[in-house]
């Protein structure tokens, strides 16, 4: 199971998606943690979202659902949409710091941000 690491440095909130064993695909709990971290960043000058272990994000962790029922899928997609809406509505600049692949919903995270900075290893 992955996690979200949140740190504040020099009035910038850094959100690290920390599930490198699955290329930082996020589950419901992680998506909710990212939403909360963005909403809690009221005093920050900016928010940076990045991924651990050489990948930015592979989107939603569909394999975590096993054999999903329609309700599980609805919750994942609804929460993912809320995550993207929260990024877009944030009154502070949200920056995607991309190192490695951004695939599927990870690409959507990048597009929802105000700015994206990518290394030469990044793919979209």
Go through the PLM ranges and name each one.
Residues 51-86, 102:
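Glycine- (often His-adjacent) and acidic-residue-rich active-site loop
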């Amino acid at each position: 199971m992955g996690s979200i690491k949140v740190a504040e440095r020099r009035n910038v909130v850094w959100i690290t998606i920390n599930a490198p064993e699955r290329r930082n695909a996020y589950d419901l709990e992680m998506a909710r943690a990212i939403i909360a971290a963005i909403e809690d960043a009221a005093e920050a000058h900016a928010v940076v979202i990045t991924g651990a272990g050489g990948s930015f994000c592979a989107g939603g962790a569909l394999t975590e659902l096993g054999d999903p029922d329609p309700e599980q899928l609805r919750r994942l997609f609804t929460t993912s949409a809320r995550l993207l809406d929260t990024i877009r509505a944030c009154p502070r600049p949200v920056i995607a710091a991309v190192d490695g692949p951004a695939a599927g919903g990870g690409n959507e995270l990048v597009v929802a941000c105000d700015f994206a900075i990518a290394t030469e290893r990044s793919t979209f």
